Amino acid sequence: MKYTSYILALQLCVLLGFSGSYGQGPFFKEIENLKEYFNASNPDVAEGGPLFIEILKNWKEESDRKIIQSQIVSFYFKLFENFKDNQVIQRSVDIIKQDMFQKFLNGSSEKLEDFKKLIQISVDDMQIQRKAINELIKVMNDLSPKSNLIKRKRSQNLFRGRRASM
């Protein structure tokens, strides 16, 4: 009985090992390359706790997580932009960016361009600040769930009206 437990445990480890290596995607090796380049596995990296992991644990609902994930992805795109001229890690950065693009933006190049535009907006520019304040009411209304509900009901009523007239 004791040997059976060991054999089952060994099989489980082998299965988990294989599924882990195949399920990681092409970015896994590239992340390991970046970790090595930045010496990110050094124990001093853990000082002060994690940057994102604890925050992500606090956000359970999918829609809420998307909000936090967008900020995290924005951070990584800015970080990668700082290393765009570094030939040593460029391939790794490009592969990771492409995979992140596929996962977060579903491969939509329009969404990527909009996302990049938002990242590039400078909050120090007075003209940008003025434009942002001018658009604040529209942005706040767009954030309001009530306005989305009204739009949805209006759209449903239009659709029902068309169906009734057919």
UniProtKB/Swiss-Prot annotation:
InterPro entries: 4_helix_cytokine-like_core, Interferon_gamma. Glycans are attached at N39, N106. Released primarily from activated T lymphocytes. It comes from the Eukaryota. GO terms for biological process: adaptive immune response; defense response to virus; humoral immune response; positive regulation of autophagy. Belongs to the type II (or gamma) interferon family. The modification Pyrrolidone carboxylic acid is found at Q24. Pfam families: IFN-gamma. Homodimer. Interacts with IFNGR1 (via extracellular domain); this interaction promotes IFNGR1 dimerization. This is Interferon gamma. GO terms for cellular component: extracellular space. One of its GO terms (molecular function) is cytokine activity. The keyword Signal applies. Residues 1-23 form the signal peptide. It is found in: Secreted. Keywords: Antiviral defense, Cytokine, Glycoprotein, Growth regulation, Pyrrolidone carboxylic acid, Secreted, Signal. Type II interferon produced by immune cells such as T-cells and NK cells that plays crucial roles in antimicrobial, antiviral, and antitumor responses by activating effector immune cells and enhancing antigen presentation. Primarily signals through the JAK-STAT pathway after interaction with its receptor IFNGR1 to affect gene regulation. Upon IFNG binding, IFNGR1 intracellular domain opens out to allow association of downstream signaling components JAK2, JAK1 and STAT1, leading to STAT1 activation, nuclear translocation and transcription of IFNG-regulated genes. The keyword Acyltransferase does not apply.
